[in-house]
């Protein structure tokens, strides 16, 4: 089972909108309309935060945002400490490529666990 621990969170949003389409714990979301969020599968799009659990389409999601330190096993690709992270094509954290917006910085990766600083 996947996890996302808020080790030192700065903010959480709940009750600020609804989810368009389903989303899973740890996926990156973006704003797609008034009070409407969706999983961000476009690496170039501006991200808003991370889902705190699994949600169905139409649910009012909890979203970690506003920075903080987190640990998770929800990420893709090879990441090293110090890497800039972005939203990947699957909506998960991945190593930043090109000029895509950075949303987090990797602090450590060990045993399938990523510790990172959220910048959004």
Residue ranges and their predicted role:
Residues 1-120:
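Surface-exposed, low-hydrophobicity beta-strand/loop segments enriched in small/polar/acidic residues
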């Amino acid at each position: 089972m996947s996890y996302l621990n808020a080790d030192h969170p700065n903010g959480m949003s709940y009750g600020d909108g609804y989810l368009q389409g389903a989303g899973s714990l740890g996926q990156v979301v973006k704003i797609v309309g008034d009070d409407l969020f969706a999983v961000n599968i476009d690496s170039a799009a501006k991200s808003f935060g991370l889902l705190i659990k699994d949600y169905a389409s139409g649910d009012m999601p909890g979203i970690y945002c506003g920075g903080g330190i987190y640990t998770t096993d929800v990420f893709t690709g090879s990441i090293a400490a110090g890497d800039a992270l972005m939203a990947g094509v699957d909506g998960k954290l991945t190593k930043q490529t090109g000029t895509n917006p950075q949303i987090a910085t990797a602090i450590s990766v060990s045993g399938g666990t990523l510790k990172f600083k959220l910048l959004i």
